[in-house]
Amino acid sequence: MTGAGNESERAVSKRIDVPPKVEEVFRGFRTCEFSTLTRDGTPIAWPLVTLWQPEERRFVLTTSIGLARKALNVRRDGRVSLLFSDPTASGLEDPPAVLVQGDAEEPDEVRTSPYHVKEYWSRLFRIQPANAMYSANPLTRYLMDWYYLRLYIYVRPSRILWWPGADFGQKPNELEVDHVG
């Protein structure tokens, strides 16, 4: 086998394969509840838009430098969770509720362009069209520059749990994710 073939096989094997219903949730839900731990260990959650990148084995989230508590919590303690529990506007019929537990990192860099992860912003503008309009307005960008200076958070799942029909009274299905590669 050629070197290119081996590289291709490695790329394929790195992908996180989840059941189709779970994949639909990751791609279809508008937001998730992103939970971090405060300095004293108290969990705190925020609604955030996510981008699922199975080939990269991660979720991408962003926050403004003006709302940086999420990133500061991640820098101190990278243990996080993403709960996909609200299917509003997803178009999905009877989706499962999905909990992702994992490790987050927030590189210590501020991005000034909304196109660092272009597919994230394409998704955001698709589900929040008014955001695209405001982002294109130079006056808005000037007055709200703090909002457009972004910190990126990358979450690598270690465990994924899902409850068919979002029935939390039932035992969840579970997928352990290895961190090989």
Q: At which residue positions do the language-model features occur?
A:
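Structural motif
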Residues: 56-58, 79, 103, 159
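Short, conserved active-site entrance elements at the starts or edges of catalytic domains
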Residues: 7-31, 35-36
